[in-house]
A protein has these predicted regions:
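Cap/insert and terminal regions of metallo-dependent hydrolase folds
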Residues: 191-292
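Conserved beta-strand hairpin/beta-sheet module of binuclear metal-dependent hydrolase folds
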Residues: 7, 23-25, 29, 34-86, ...
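C-terminal regulatory/interaction regions
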Residues: 2-7, 22-30, 37, 268-302
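Metallo-beta-lactamase
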Residues: 123-178
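Active-site metal-binding motif and surrounding structural segment of the metallo-beta-lactamase
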Residues: 77-122
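Structured catalytic core of nucleotide-sugar glycosyltransferases
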Residues: 48-58, 100-109, 127, 158
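Active-site neighborhood of phospho(di)ester-bond hydrolases with catalytic His/Asp-centered motifs
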Residues: 70-73, 93-101, 121-124, 181-184, ...
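Active-site environment of divalent metal-dependent phosphoester hydrolases
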Residues: 55, 103-106, 127-129, 165-166, ...
Length: 302
């Protein structure tokens, strides 16, 4: 009996040690302040994830010559409210970059485009899908997937990503010696995707689900589970970690995990999986944060 108790205590001690190490990793990686606030810094580039998850995605990038949204996946009212937390308004936007036509990326697009006459940037297939889905004609500024163009002092590099939309894209924004990569909604990472974001200083990458939580979820039909797990679905926590390991360089300084499923993932789980991988590959220079659905992240000023 004593031997059994000693063995149990030993296993408990090991478990506590492992948990303590993981907690330490998470604390080290999550260096951002806890609350969003007004943009007051004089540095040239600001990034605010206004919200990210299965119910809506929207990010804000500000430079001296551009104020851009990447997707508009919340209602126009919600986007206005979230911009207000950082002292900004939709009226001052330079344009909106659209990754693809799914509703969690375009919910507020019609009202923003109609009322404010904002430029909408997307490719031809996405533009056609927008007209059909929103039941209204939206004038879009078209680009060819794989091409580059400029908005003020921002060079926008586009590239194809594998997702079940018409012609989904990722973005790499280059401005003022800063490179910001956006990788959400993709079922796997191709060599092209990895090549395009390898030079990023900031990476927003989806960690949509934990595979076991998804498989066990009683509210998801099997057909939906197959779609999410497929090669044109969404990245799991482990798949996101694999991708980051592939592209890791000393240039990558900040990372946001986005598009987390409320039912099939947990922020602390996604963060722990990525933090452990960063620790394993010696990437202690990367500050890791998890984007939330309901509140903006603190602004990152670069």
């Amino acid at each position: 009996m004593r031997a059994q108790l000693a063995e149990i205590r030993g296993e408990t001690s090991k478990t506590q040690t492992r948990r303590g190490a993981i907690d330490k990793i998470v604390r080290l990686k999550n260096r951002c302040p806890p609350q969003p606030g007004l943009i007051t810094s004089n540095v040239p580039v600001h990034l605010t994830i206004l919200g990210s998850g299965s119910a809506g995605n929207c990010a804000y990038v500000e430079t001296p010559e551009a104020r851009l949204l990447i997707d508009a996946g919340f209602s126009a009212r919600q986007i206005r409210q979230r911009l207000a937390t950082i002292g900004r308004t939709p009226e001052n936007l330079t344009g909106i970059l659209v990754t693809h036509e799914h509703i969690d990326h375009i919910q507020g697009l019609r009202i923003l485009a109609e009322k404010l006459n904002l430029p909408i940037y997307c490719n031809r297939a996405t533009s056609d899908a927008l007209q059909y889905q929103l039941k209204v004609k939206i004038e879009c500024r078209l680009f060819a997937t794989g091409g580059c163009f400029e908005i003020g002092d921002v060079q926008v590099e586009t590239f194809s990503i594998p997702h079940d939309a018409q012609d989904p894209v990722g973005y790499l924004l280059r401005t003022n010696n800063v490179k910001i990569g956006f990788l959400t909604d993709l079922g796997h990472t191709t060599n092209l995707v990895l090549q395009r974001v390898r030079s990023a200083n900031v990476l927003v990458i989806e960690a949509n689900h934990d595979v076991k939580m998804l498989q066990d979820c009683p509210r998801r039909p099997w057909s939906l589970k197959q779609r999410i797990l497929g090669r044109h679905g969404h990245l799991s926590n482990d798949s996101a970690a694999d991708a980051v390991q592939e592209i890791m360089t000393s240039d990558l300084r900040y990372m946001y995990l986005g598009h987390l499923s409320r039912e099939c993932n947990k922020p602390e789980l996604a963060q722990t999986v990525m933090a452990q991988r960063l620790e394993k590959i010696g990437a202690n220079h990367v500050a890791l944060s998890v984007a939330r659905q309901d509140v903006p992240c603190p602004t990152l000023s670069l």
